[in-house]
Amino acid sequence: MRGVETRIQEIRHAVFTEVAKMAYEEGPVDKKIEALPYKIIPGETGNFRNDVFLERAIVGERLRMARGLPYRGAAEPAPVSDGIMEADKPEGYYTPPLINVIKFACNACDEKKVHVTDGCQGCLAHPCMEVCPKKAISLDRVTGKSIIDQDACIKCGRCATVCSYNAIIVQERPCAKACGMKAITSDENGKATIDYDKCVSCGMCLVNCPFGAISDKSQ
């Protein structure tokens, strides 16, 4: 997120710092890069996702991309250092594309969803129900609070607009919302995927992903 220093920036800085150090240190780069996920994510327990192995795998892909290497999915059995010796040349250039989704880091956020929060007061007017063009809102007969039928909802957001208590929210996938080219959709697993025919590599998805699942490459 722009203007806010988060743990995502902390990891990003650590990755690029360690990659930069490699240029000034002696020794084989393949062995160095294999050890770096353990240096950046030390210990026995995870710091961010409660799974230290997943965290190290994500950092491993970030390290590869920081060296300009291609992203690999979780199903590809290869060490972090795969291809690094060929890429470790002064005239080397990153392997396109520049912006990549690390699929196993993606939270598979809903593309768009309308929620009734605990702020609903169960008011008498129920303007949310009145303005819904698909009659997707009903009432809980015990509490009087609104319930949205997600199968019928078309995510127009009219209910959120008229709620006097701002108790209805429209959630959108942050990376897709930030993309001015509408280049981000979902794959068969609900993970974010980039249409590179539309993508202009602006990086807005990268800075807006709360899970740090989108990374860029360096040369």
Descriptions of predicted regions:
Residues 1-162, 166-178, 182-190:
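Ferredoxin-type iron-sulfur electron-transfer modules and their immediate structural context
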Residues 167-219:
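Flanking helices and flexible, charged tails adjoining ferredoxin-like Fe-S electron-transfer domains
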